[in-house]
């Protein structure tokens, strides 16, 4: 069974379609796993493998991103452990998806970015007003998720509504965005190398 799912590029229809197909396969495997549990003595039961979502994305569409959030939440509610790893860039909607991981890793060269939703809506005034109300509602939901999963403050989130909030690796650790990391400084020893 595949335990690593890649989210690379713009979060749009094709990327989400692939993600849903891959996670459909995982959900099917999980159902088979649960069926087999009834026939195995508890002491011989192995845990279902953790799933890792590797993200390298500048973000994308709120609607497609929400489909990914829903699927991750569905898997977690069923008892599947879902972790996330960021590689290089994790911006906008990808940042929100990343925060859904129970264990959140990132490479040292990774940067994160949060900002308010944007739109290229054109059309009738009422349609534009409805779109703004929708985006404000989604931003409120995303802000609540960020506040729940990190040490970021509401003040900082409000500032991100005015401009992009760029976050480097070290700051991401301090803010609890990355919650699993190797502290290289603590691992360094003063002993001489044997060669």
PLM feature spans:
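Terminal-region recognition feature
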Residues: 1-195
